Amino acid sequence: MPHNTKSMDNTLNIKDNHVQIGGRKSKLAVVQSEIVKECIVEKFPELSCSVLALSTLGDKVQSKPLYSFGGKALWTKELEILLLEQVEEYPRLDLIVHSLKDIPTNLPEEFELGCILNREDARDALVMKSGSSYKSLADLPDGSLVGTSSVRRSSQLLKNHPKLRFDSVRGNLQTRLNKLDDENSPFECLLLASAGLIRIGLGDRITAHLDAPEMYYAVGQGALGIEIRKGDEKMLQLLKTIEDLPTTYCCLAERSLMRHLEGGCSVPIGVQSHYNESTNELSLKAIIVSPDGIHFVEDEYKGVVNNKDDADAIGIKVGDLLSAKGGREILNSINFERINLPPSSNTPTPQPITPITTNNS
């Protein structure tokens, strides 16, 4: 449920007392749109809400790994068109529900991030093949094949488990699980977001949660973000009542870090954040790992956050710390055509990049 319990005057004067929600067509996306719908109706019972589910480019093209698209607006563009205007039989949208990790940190000027909802478990999940006796990545024999389409996950996997192999696996969650469980499947396990499995009732498939430092999660992972038209004051007022401030502060810091480093959602930046409501302190840890798992930089920073600008500043600070250690060099040197090559048998031990300067303040 949303953390913000502030009651507001319900005189929003929304046209026809109706909110048109848009989202992707996958089962998970529909569930997430329904979560937002329920939150709105709970706060404003006089409003009606409906959900329009559409396929996006990321849904339509399942044969290519995510990195090959460049990671920019892969899940958002088609829906954004309907935020601006009605198209044929499709109604104009008032808002779009996204997994926050899929929303680019730099949105087109016509749109803005309206709010961030309460975060589900942000960690990655290890899902073993049905009937497997293995309980952790460390249990797997050398050369075992792990399924993931995420550069962030595969790079950290190679850093911490260099004897394992990985390959891209696409499709919705159930499709990927079916591929894993097929008796002819080459995969021993999958790496997936815990939040998605939990939201569609498949939390029992989680063999283990992966915590830092073994696996830092993606920027915004586990949180829902709502995209709206820029300057839509009525929607902003409505969404203010369902946002979750601790989640918002953490995710804004994470997104500020990614924006500062100019990294799209398909680059190997991992994070871990926490907001202490008693002290108003936000801590942000982050890691950048080269796709082969050999080079990495990591750092952390903690500071007082009383507003969204403070949260942005934390992200910029961590970005500067990582840059000083060579983080930008890792991101700039990525060759996406080689990301999916398996590690060689003589993979070197992962090494942190020698810092250009040292700054822990």
From Swiss-Prot:
Annotated protein name in UniProt: Porphobilinogen deaminase
Higher taxonomy: Eukaryota, Fungi, Dikarya, Ascomycota, Saccharomycotina
S-(dipyrrolylmethanemethyl)cysteine sites (modified residues): 265
Recorded catalytic activity of this chain's protein: 4 porphobilinogen + H2O = hydroxymethylbilane + 4 NH4(+)
GO MF, any single term: hydroxymethylbilane synthase activity
Catalytic class of the enzyme: transferase
Cofactor field: dipyrromethane
Function: Tetrapolymerization of the monopyrrole PBG into the hydroxymethylbilane pre-uroporphyrinogen in several discrete steps.
GO BP of this protein: protoporphyrinogen IX biosynthetic process
Any one GO cellular component localisation term in the record: cytoplasm
Keyword Transferase annotated: yes
Keywords assigned by UniProt, alphabetized: Heme biosynthesis, Porphyrin biosynthesis, Transferase
Organism: Debaryomyces hansenii (strain ATCC 36239 / CBS 767 / BCRC 21394 / JCM 1990 / NBRC 0083 / IGC 2968) (Yeast)
Protein's UniProt keywords contain Transmembrane helix: no
EC number of this enzyme: 2.5.1.61
